[in-house]
């Protein structure tokens, strides 16, 4: 049974993280109907987050190698006093802006006493005996996706990412990642609304999702109250990496062929259902 749990949880997390359908909202539904409202962290959840990050990095290996090279060359330029914050190299600017987006996420590591870190405090809002907020978050995610679909039909996105969208993405990511939103769905949508090129927006979103997932995974491992076996960990890691690699390709296919509306309608339907359930929970609990 523990092996089946590892298999299904790895697939579930990979699908809900990479496709814009919100892992947190689906997880909250599972915990709600299991009457688990404590918000305890599972070591298996943490290790799968790390594995999904690895899978995304493998799927986008060329981009990650290029960014690592840019980072190394930047350090070299700093040592030699040749670094320029306004470098015109697109790859260097991409790296600079990704760092800008990630800086606000350091706030997650603020200690919050018995609650652990600020991240775990924000995350605990999912386990409040009602699915009302998750339903709202899912519908907002769907709204972002529909807005993007509309934007792409009326204008051509031809901008490169700059500091302003990078800062906005960082603040948005800080707020939404622990809640019932889809991180990839909302961040990708925000970038497209800013007019960023579609391919660059998707690459940027997936790129910054890797450190976000790594931080989440490490925090969950450090604060885990539910243990896992070595066999569970190995199986979950392998499945999550493979599934994530495939799902990145699938997401790119959806974006390239203008199929995001299917995911937007799924978010709408699922969000509406759990919103109604949440209303009844508020009335009868």
Give each language-model segment a name:
Residues 1-285:
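Multi-pass membrane proteins that catalyze or facilitate reactions on polyprenyl-/lipid-phosphate substrates
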């Amino acid at each position: 049974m523990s092996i089946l749990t590892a298999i299904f949880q790895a697939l579930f997390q990979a699908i809900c993280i990479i496709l814009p359908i919100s892992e947190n909202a689906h997880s909250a539904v599972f915990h709600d109907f299991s009457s688990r409202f404590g918000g305890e962290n599972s070591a298996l959840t943490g290790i799968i987050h790390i594995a999904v990050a690895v899978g995304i990095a493998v799927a986008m290996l060329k981009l990650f190698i290029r960014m690592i090279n840019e980072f190394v060359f930047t350090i070299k330029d700093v040592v030699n006093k040749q670094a320029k914050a306004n470098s015109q190299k697109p790859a260097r600017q991409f790296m600079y802006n990704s760092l800008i987006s990630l800086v606000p996420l350091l706030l997650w590591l603020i200690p919050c006493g018995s609650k652990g870190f600020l991240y775990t405090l924000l995350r605990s809002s999912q386990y409040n005996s009602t699915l009302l907020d998750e339903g709202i978050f899912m519908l907002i995610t769907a709204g972002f996706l529909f807005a993007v679909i509309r934007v792409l039909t009326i204008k051509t996105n031809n901008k490169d990412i700059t500091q302003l969208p990078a800062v906005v993405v960082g603040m948005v990511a800080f707020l939404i990642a622990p809640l019932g939103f889809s991180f990839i769905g909302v961040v990708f949508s925000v970038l497209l609304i800013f007019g960023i090129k579609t391919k660059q927006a998707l690459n940027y979103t997936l790129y910054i999702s890797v450190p976000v997932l790594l931080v989440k995974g490490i925090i969950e491992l450090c604060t885990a109250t539910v243990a896992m076996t070595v066999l569970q960990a190995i199986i979950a890691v392998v499945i999550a990496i493979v599934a994530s690699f495939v799902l990145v390709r699938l997401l790119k296919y959806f974006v390239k062929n203008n199929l995001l509306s299917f995911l937007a309608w799924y978010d709408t339907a699922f969000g509406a259902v759990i919103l109604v359930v949440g209303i009844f929970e508020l009335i009868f609990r």
